[in-house]
Amino acid sequence: MREIKEEYDCLHIEISEYIQSPEKTLVEMDAKQEFAFDLYFKRLPVFSNKIREVLKKISIDAYTKIYQRAGDNIRASGQVNSSKFDESKVFLFPSTINKIIKSAHHMARKNSGSCFIVIDAIRNPYEAIFFKERYAGFYLVSINTENENRLAHLRSAHKFSESQIKELDEKEYPSKLAGYSKFVSQNIQKCIEISDIHIHNPREEQFNNIELKCQLAWYVSLIQHPGLVMPTSLESCMQIAYTVKQSSGCISRQVGAAVTDAEFSVKSVGWNNTPQGQVPCLLRNAEDLLRGQDSHAYSEYERNDSKFREVLHGKYDKLRKSPLLEGRNLSFCFKDMQNEIDGEKNQVHTRSLHAEENAFLQISKHGGMKLSGGILFTTASPCELCSKKAYQLGISKIVFIDPYPGIATRHTLLVGSNSPELQLYRGAVGRAYHQLYQPIMPYKDELETLLSIPGNANKKALRTKALEKENLELRDELERLKSQLESLKNEG
């Protein structure tokens, strides 16, 4: 580390002076922007590569581990060497990146050039939301591949061992985050869930990435020029599933599903929610249950079981009057409470139907129709139970976004003679679907304006010209007839 210590100290002094330097005049502001551009786009990338190489000499995964720990600490405290939580520092990373973006825009304007920014890479969902709230043209892009391809890449390209891969997965795909860890830790699964555009990188051939390039070209073109092409059938159907998930009353996560026939004609939609007639968890209140109010919203078990009410009282009695609620509903998760009572993790206790299950049941509820050969779209991926239902119904393809951390794929679906095809979703969803595929002006109007194609405004002139031509022809015909008539008179 000695080989980079001197350079680090010099950079640290320069950055400290840069932060403290005044920016009261346009000249001072311009100087700071130019310094920031030179620092972040030219000098720091070179220094960062030096750090990477030094850390790799320590161990294969030293760079990843140290940078992940440093990132968590900076989000928590604003300092690399402290994990003490300070809520004012949560958005330090995106705030700094935002300043870097402004310096790039400044230099682009100064040089009369264009400016397109790519941030590689965002692994904290709240940092993504920071940019979504500030830039209408921000798109969170997830590049996904099958898990087998991902593992093979980590083993071959990064030389990771199985234990190192497991440790990396536990860090980037945490099973459960509590407290302030939700704000400072990496959570790639949540980032995938809120992504605007999903790109599929098959990684089937080491030196052939044409499929990846084609997808990137498609969406970069649409970002720069919305409405150039129509959405694919996959995108249209997944957008429906993505839209209906907002109807979910689950307080843990929202999932949507759509079932179509083989021609992408939608037959049913569903979302994770309680059965019809039961109140969703989002609308239930622990205070109401403790006070015995709104009894139809709670089960006989919740109202009368002494052990359950003891746990409920211990968790929520002091919280129901908390000023921090500020009008929020004090909802609670029955599954979590029951699992705490039983001392185990059991998904059976969930009150909600799964989105895929709900979509299947909606079809039978309203008369039924053939689903064999159909396609299931889900904004998550089906669990073991929903996978068995899809298999039994003869679903031929399952299109999913978020890989489920279970054995549904390998155990439940990839078995027997009628296994459905599993396809990672590629396409735009949510806000991006509308922004990318809705043209700013009708394409015909755009071409007419761009190429000066004569439009409807010349119709009157064209009609006048046609009438004038017709009038001349009629005059000629009249003169001919007059001449013939004169000849006949002379002969008589």
Language-model region placement:
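N-terminal helicase ATP-binding lobe
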Residues: 95-101, 115-119, 127
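Small-molecule kinase domains that catalyze NTP-dependent phosphoryl transfer to phosphate-bearing small molecules
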Residues: 103, 127, 156-214
